[in-house]
UniProtKB/Swiss-Prot annotation:
PANTHER family, alphabetized: NADH UBIQUINONE OXIDOREDUCTASE SUBUNIT ND6, NADH-UBIQUINONE OXIDOREDUCTASE CHAIN 6
Keyword Transmembrane helix: yes
Family stated for the protein in its record: Belongs to the complex I subunit 6 family.
Subcellular location: Mitochondrion membrane
Matching InterPro entries: ComplexI_Subunit6, NADH_UbQ/plastoQ_OxRdtase_su6, Nuo/plastoQ_OxRdtase_6_NuoJ
Superkingdom: Eukaryota
Transmembrane segments: 1-21, 27-47, 48-68, 87-107, 113-133, 139-159
Gene name of the encoded protein: MT-ND6
Reaction equations catalysed: a ubiquinone + NADH + 5 H(+)(in) = a ubiquinol + NAD(+) + 4 H(+)(out)
Topology of the protein relative to the lipid bilayer: Multi-pass membrane protein
Pfam families the record matches: Oxidored_q3 (PF00499)
Main location: mitochondrion
The UniProt record lists the keyword Transmembrane: yes
Protein name per Swiss-Prot or TrEMBL: NADH-ubiquinone oxidoreductase chain 6
Length: 173
């Protein structure tokens, strides 16, 4: 199980690197989906299944809409792929900066902590996941409204960016 969690963490980092290092949104969306699945799988392995499901649905629902509109705006006949030298160099430089930051920053000493899952406290404890469901529906209502309003505003901003000069989002095919 430990190796699986480490594998999910590696997939999460590689997915984020794929989104950050690729200038073409055609291939960047693959990195986004990989990072989202790995991050939610990581939460799922810790026992927080409801939060993982909500984050997966909200994150992919909101971000894939933005990627669809940016793909329609980019419309390149020959998009740059991950195998291009510029993209590979950018990814290698991001990994180098990350490794140097971890080594120089002294974070290697703090890797000794253990992971506590939600069922490790005892038989009479309430699972954190069930407490999260109650918090989502009681105290989190305002945050859900703010997040929904932000996603709606982002949708209108992207629609305005894709609109073009005169005809709106409709283009000649």
């Amino acid at each position: 199980m430990t190796y699986f969690v480490l594998f999910l963490g590696l997939c999460f980092v590689l997915g984020g690197l794929a989104v950050a290092s690729n200038p073409s949104p055609y291939y960047g969306v693959v990195g986004l989906v990989l990072a989202s699945i790995a991050g939610c799988g990581w939460l799922l392995s810790l026992g927080v299944s409801f939060v993982s499901l909500v984050l997966f649905m909200v994150y992919l629902g909101g971000m894939l809409v933005v990627f669809v509109y940016s793909v329609s705006l980019a419309a390149d006949p020959f998009p740059e792929a991950w195998g291009d030298w510029r993209v590979v160099g950018y990814g290698v430089s991001l990994i180098t900066v990350l490794v140097v930051g971890v080594v120089v920053g002294g974070f290697v000493e703090y890797w000794d902590f253990g992971v506590i899952t939600v069922d490790s406290v005892g038989m009479f404890s309430v699972r954190l996941d069930f407490g999260g469901v109650a918090m989502f529906y009681s105290c989190g209502v305002g945050m859900f409204l703010v997040a929904g309003w932000g996603l709606l505003l982002t949708l209108f901003v992207v629609l305005e960016l894709v609109r073009g000069l005169t005809r709106g989002a409709i283009r000649a095919v």
